[in-house]
């Protein structure tokens, strides 16, 4: 299953969120990677306990749990707090499988993650790359569920995290 989740935010809200994210400090993304995926992960991430990550994470979870398509497709019992990632020129997250069990920061609670979601804040015309590529039947197939294109800001997708996949970004700088 792979679904597109439209209009999680208005374009204006997405732009405001993006500006706030652009103005904050980012860390090495390997911080939250499991042992295997740390070998493939080369991106930046907002610290899980960063006040902006908590504020925006709560807002995203609130919007998703009010979104009829997300709720009917995902049927979540729990929603793990979102992680905020960004990619600079030449960075990527090579072939990996998302962690099946995640630990909540500052807690002993562990959450099984049966669904992964990505929400976009940057217009696709402002960067090159960013496609999700899934690995199926020992072949690199663009989108086991069909091609997953880069989405408009305030859109996202959700799907099975179990297959190997990669995310790459060629050049995140806006075109002149």
From Swiss-Prot:
What stretch or stretches form a coiled coil here? none
Gene Ontology biological-process entries: DNA damage response; intracellular iron ion homeostasis
One example GO MF annotation: iron ion binding
- Residue span(s) of domain Fe2OG dioxygenase: 78-147
Entry keyword annotation includes Oxidoreductase: yes
Q: Name its co-factor(s).
A: Fe(2+); L-ascorbate
Q: What is its EC number?
A: 1.14.11.-
Q: Which InterPro entries match?
A: PKHD_hydroxylase (IPR023550), Pro_4_hyd_alph (IPR006620)
**Which UniProt keywords are listed?**
Dioxygenase, Oxidoreductase
Asked whether the keyword Oxidoreductase is assigned, the reply is yes
Q: How is the cofactor bound?
A: Binds 1 Fe(2+) ion per subunit.
NCBIfam families under this entry?
A: PRK05467.1-3, PRK05467.1-4
Q: Know the name of this protein?
A: PKHD-type hydroxylase Mfla_0096
User: Could you tell me which species this protein originates from?
Assistant: Methylobacillus flagellatus (strain ATCC 51484 / DSM 6875 / VKM B-1610 / KT)
């Amino acid at each position: 299953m792979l679904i597109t989740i439209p209009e999680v935010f208005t374009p204006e809200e997405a732009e405001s969120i993006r500006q706030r994210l652009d103005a904050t400090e980012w860390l090495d993304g390997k911080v939250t990677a499991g042992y295997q995926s740390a070998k493939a992960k080369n991106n930046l991430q907002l610290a899980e306990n960063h006040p902006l990550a908590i504020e925006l994470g709560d807002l995203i979870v609130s919007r998703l749990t009010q979104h009829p398509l997300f709720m009917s497709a995902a049927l979540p019992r729990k929603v793990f707090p979102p992680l905020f990632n960004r990619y600079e020129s030449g960075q990527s997250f090579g072939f990996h499988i998302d962690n099946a069990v995640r630990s909540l920061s500052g807690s002993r609670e562990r959450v099984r993650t049966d669904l992964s979601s990505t929400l976009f804040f940057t217009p696709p015309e402002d960067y090159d790359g960013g496609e999700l590529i899934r690995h199926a039947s020992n072949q690199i197939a663009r989108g086991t569920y069909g091609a997953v294109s880069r989405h408009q800001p305030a859109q996202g997708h959700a799907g099975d995290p179990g297959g190997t996949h990669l995310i790459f970004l060629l050049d995140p700088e806006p075109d002149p």
